[in-house]
């Protein structure tokens, strides 16, 4: 056992799950894409208010999903995924504002956000069904 009460087999299992989870993979890809979008907009358009909000919410999605994998209970797991979903929805809003205001024109990042949101909704529904 390590200092956190998790044995080696549990750590290995969690590492495997985390490295192969489509939700974690997609949310990390999205976070990296958000960082690039925000850097581009800051450099080319000198806009910081929207991008600061977007970078916070867009990178927090994956962080909350990762936290969920180490939740202390099923209810905690569901709560963390729900926070990630709210952050995803917020990111979608900031992206819509950036795109519709003309600060950014590549809608593929918005498509990625919607993809992550759908995965989160599906994961939440499954987790809630398994918790009943």
Residue ranges of predicted features:
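Short, C-terminally biased terminal segments at protein or domain edges
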Residues: 1-67, 71-132
